[in-house]
Amino acid sequence: IGYVQKGVSENVSVMTGILNPGESSGVPIIKKLLKDDIQDQIISFIDCPPGSACVVMESIKDADYCILVAEPSLFGAHNLAMVYDLVKMFGKPHGVILNKCLNGNNPSEEFCLKNGINILEKIPFDNELGFLNSNGLIAVRESEKFKNIFSSLLTKIIKEAQHETALDS
């Protein structure tokens, strides 16, 4: 079906599931990733593809806190609505990061406001960030501006997740 790759970048452990071409489901790889070393980690982030497919459900079903990421478009808002329905169905505490934000209309932000969803951060559209990402560079290591944005975001996420999971206890 595929395989798992593991590595370390500075003090961050990274695990990636690689699905073989032609396979219909990545769920077995997700299960292997989650079963392996992840329980030993203090903080773990599981990145999922957009949408509400089985791999997304498998990834969130045992999560303590879910971070939904949406772009400021009708498609982004539609995808956000689908994933929002999933986290509600699973009863998961959650917050939203709005990505690639510009001034003006933001259907994803409107969806959050209408549904009382906590917006953790609005990351602005930025050509420099796109350049760094497309060149495989880690933005927080290359730019003090992005280090500040994402360090602040991590602090908010940890605080929010600890608060929400304490309420659920």
Q: Where are the regions that the model predicts?
A:
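Short, glycine/acidic-enriched loop or turn micro-motifs at the edges of active sites
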Residues: P50, L74, L102
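Inter-motif core of Ras-like GTPase G domains
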Residues: A53-L74, L80
